[in-house]
Amino acid sequence: VSPTRAIAQLRSLWTNVPSDPEFEQRLAEWLAAEEDRRTTWLAWLGSQAVGMASLFEYRRMPRPGRSDSRWGYLSNMFVCEESRNQGIGSALLAAIIAAADKRDYARLVLSPSEAAVAFYKRAGFAVPDGAAGGDRLLVRGESLAP
């Protein structure tokens, strides 16, 4: 199974929408357009992809008196229901955090589902200072100050 096909299968499971005939091609084109700033990890059990997560690189606009910075946005984290609670999500998250640290990102940001907030908080993510109480934006690293 190619990585693109595996991502397509997982995306279909995640959204609970059957794949349409052109979906894999649209996904391949999207992945190609994003490849300079997005990395996607796949978790496999044997030959079956059971999880995925993406890390997108955001490049901050330069500003006088401040060095340029980059930060990561974690997205598309998904583990098949039958493969949950086996450490797969934790392994994907550890890989994302390690990559963000290696790339020297100023911060790692995500917007999790309500059900996943505790999972990310256990990994060191927190609501940024000044965020509204209902927001689910979580940050690991420096704050989101302008």
Task: Annotate each PLM feature.
Residues 65-81:
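Conserved acetyl-CoA binding element of GNAT-fold acetyltransferases
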Residues 1-9:
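A short beta-loop-alpha structural element at the N-terminal edge
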Residues 18-44, 54, 60-61:
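Active-site rim helix/loop that mediates acceptor-substrate recognition in acyltransferases
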Residues 108-118, 133-135:
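Conserved beta-strand-loop-alpha-helix junction that forms the acyl-donor binding cleft
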Residues 93, 100-112:
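Conserved GNAT acetyl-CoA-binding A-motif
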Residues 42, 48-57, 73-78:
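Conserved beta-strand in the GNAT
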Residues 121-132:
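Conserved acetyl-CoA-binding loop of GNAT-fold acetyltransferases
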Residues 83, 87-95:
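Conserved acetyl-CoA pyrophosphate-binding loop and the N-cap/start of the following alpha-helix
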